[in-house]
Amino acid sequence: MDYNKTSRTLAGIFLTGLCIALLAVSTSRTNGPERKSAERFDKAMLQAEIRAYILENPDIIFEAAAIVRQREAEEESRRDVDLVKEYWDELQNDGRSYVGGNPEGDITLVEFLDYRCGYCRKAFEEVEMLLEDDGNIRFIIKEFPILGEASIIASQFAIAVRNIHGADSYKSIHDTLMTFTGEPTPEVLVEIATTFGLEPTPIFEEMMSQTVMDEINENRALGQKMQISGTPTFVFGEALLRGYLPLDAMREVAKEQRGS
């Protein structure tokens, strides 16, 4: 931010406020018709002064708007930190979600994702690179299908594989779905399962179970409580990051969260 411009903007706002205060004091000392006449005169004079100042310094309108936006962003950031703290246990220790990377890492990255989300796919390789290069990040995946029926089917399939075959098989399926751009039809899912030596029938049965849908619904409920409406959304340490983040930016967040 340009602090000289900010100072000028705040000075303008201060002067305007001072004018209003002085005029209020002056009019308060008069009574009856004289006061009403003074108020009309003072109001007209004030309006003229403000108009003249703005015409001479039109940039202050944009600068003031920028200050408001910055304050709103700072307030949103504070709210996001509070949300992460409030729902920390659900984010970190729900007892179901896949935990990878370095499970004993000194910092945790949680990703809410949808297999049909283009930006999730874009982030996929960069998240994998981050985990590999850093080596000390605990990674949690929250299945968060929000882009229609195909998204739900893909998440059901991945969760069912995890429930039956464990975390390693889940990660293989997850990686495949993140790079798959077609429709998750039954034929496609059979092919994916058999590629990894998995029997499709039990997986399809598990997909329809209440356990799988409960997990998806609980992730959605958590997202709603945390005001998450899009994917990808990351919780990196105590930082809530809404939307795609490039690799270099994620590395910077890791440094900030570690205090280095």
What is each of the regions a protein language model found here?
Residues 3-149, 205-208, 213-230, 259-260:
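Extracytoplasmic thiol/disulfide redox context detector
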Residues 145-231, 235-260:
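Cysteine-centric redox/oxidoreductase cores and disulfide-bonded domains
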